[in-house]
A protein has these predicted regions:
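A short beta-strand motif characteristic of beta-propeller blades
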Residues: 78-84, 121-131, 168-177, 218-225, ...
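Beta-rich, blade/repeat-based domains predominating
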Residues: 85-97, 130-145, 177-194, 226-240, ...
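A short helix->beta-strand "capping" segment at the edge of beta-propeller domains
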Residues: 67-86
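A short loop-to-beta-strand structural motif that recurs across blades of beta-propeller domains
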Residues: 110-113, 157-161, 207-211, 252-255, ...
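Conserved beta-propeller blade signature
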Residues: 100-102, 148-150, 194-196, 242-244, ...
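Blade-level signature of beta-propeller repeat domains, shared across WD40, Kelch, NHL, RCC1
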Residues: 329-357
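Short loop/turn segments immediately following the C-termini of beta-strands
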Residues: 106-107, 154, 200-202, 248, ...
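Short loop/turn segments that connect beta-strands within beta-propeller blades
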Residues: 116-120, 163-167, 213-217, 257-261, ...
Length: 357
């Protein structure tokens, strides 16, 4: 009750209570008002304590891994800059330290161009050989353990390996029962350091994912049954060992468990979050999957599922078709560094776009 209302109320009461021999009615009325104010203060304090208790509970649950606090970062990244000087770039990878960016080019001299973290070129990679034109680098990945650089080559049908200084080390030519006839394309490393490779050799029935360990020429195992994939391109492996494959000609993102069993997928379509021609795939440190949809001229972003059988939830997409900043003309590869900076090869615009949250 406002002070003015209390004053008006008191004016209607007698100053003395004749029945009590001098007890002040005014004093009694003030005491009631003070009690009301005290009760309001106590109620406010209790409300504050309840809010603090809820906040503390949320923090405890987040630290225990039961229920993460909501992210304060924006839903989608924004355009930062572009790296120019590469002929129709296809694949991109970033070293674990973030100080080297590797970009494959599919035209011109067909080099793997090496940039520092600021986007300045510091070198190139090219396999040895007499015929300088007989090589076509496509995808690239960097070992999280050795920082060696792995490059798939469509013409040589192998994976070229370089050390961090750029020295050529060897070629991986899949051999043995599983590796015979393989044609390497997409590359990624798993949490245990194994190399994952999409294989597009032969007919569609032979397209699959091969897993190599320790630089061996012979695959440890294959993922996917006959006919499961149709020209699988880029792929990424999450911390649990689940594999996300850009199954390009099938127009879907296929998600496999570590044993190679198909769990769920995002299909081709025209609805929100549907795909058309997925190529590059990357996973960041915040539980998000990024899929380059080449003919849609966008990068789609999804929330990783808790189980491989669940379909990733669609967050949104970034990029549009065009030649301006933040626009794509047939993007292909994607990589994310340790701080969350995103690199996308913008093939027909001859550049690598840089995005971040």
């Amino acid at each position: 009750m406002a002070p003015q209302d209390e004053t008006l109320s008191l004016a209607r009461e007698p100053l003395l209570d004749a029945g009590t021999g001098g007890t002040s009615g005014l004093a009694g009325q003030l005491t009631d008002a003070e009690r009301k104010r005290r009760r309001r203060k106590i109620a406010a304090l209790l409300a504050i304590l309840v809010v603090l208790a809820i906040i503390i509970l949320l923090i405890i649950r987040a630290l225990s891994g039961k229920s993460p606090l909501p992210s304060l970062s924006p839903t989608l990244p924004h355009y930062v800059s572009s790296i120019y000087g590469v002929d129709e770039p296809m694949g991109v990878a970033v070293s674990p330290s973030g100080d080297r960016i590797y970009v494959t080019e599919s035209e011109g001299p067909r080099l793997v161009r090496v940039y520092n973290g600021s986007g300045n070129q510091v070198g190139t990679l090219k396999p040895p050989g007499r015929n300088d034109t007989w090589h076509l680098p496509v995808y690239v990945a960097v070992s999280p353990r050795t920082e060696d650089v792995y490059v798939s080559d469509r013409l040589r049908q192998d994976v070229e390996v370089y050390d961090p200084s750029g020295k050529y080390l060897r070629a991986i030519r899949p051999a043995g029962r599983l590796g015979k006839g393989a044609d390497p394309l997409g590359l990624a490393f798993g949490p245990e350091g194994d190399l994952y490779m999409t294989d597009v050799g032969g007919s569609r029935q032979n397209h699959r994912v091969l897993v190599f360990g320790g630089g061996s020429q012979q695959p440890l195992r294959q993922l996917g049954s006959r006919g499961m994939f149709w020209f699988p391109n880029g792929l990424a492996v999450d911390s649990r060992g689940d594999v996300y494959v850009g199954d390009s000609n099938d127009g879907r993102l296929a998600i496999l468990d570590p044993a190679g069993k198909l769990g769920s997928s995002i299909q081709r379509g025209v609805g929100e979050g549907d795909l058309n021609l997925p190529r590059g795939v990357a996973i960041d440190g915040h539980g998000r999957a990024f899929v380059v949809d080449t003919t849609a001229q966008v990068v789609d972003v999804y929330r990783l599922p808790k189980q491989v059988t669940e379909v990733p939830s669609y967050i949104g997409s970034f990029g549009t078709e065009g030649i301006g900043n933040g626009q794509f003309r047939y993007p292909n590869g994607i990589a994310i560094n340790g701080s969350g900076r995103i690199y996308v090869t913008d093939r027909e615009n001859g550049r690598v776009q840089v995005w971040e949250y």
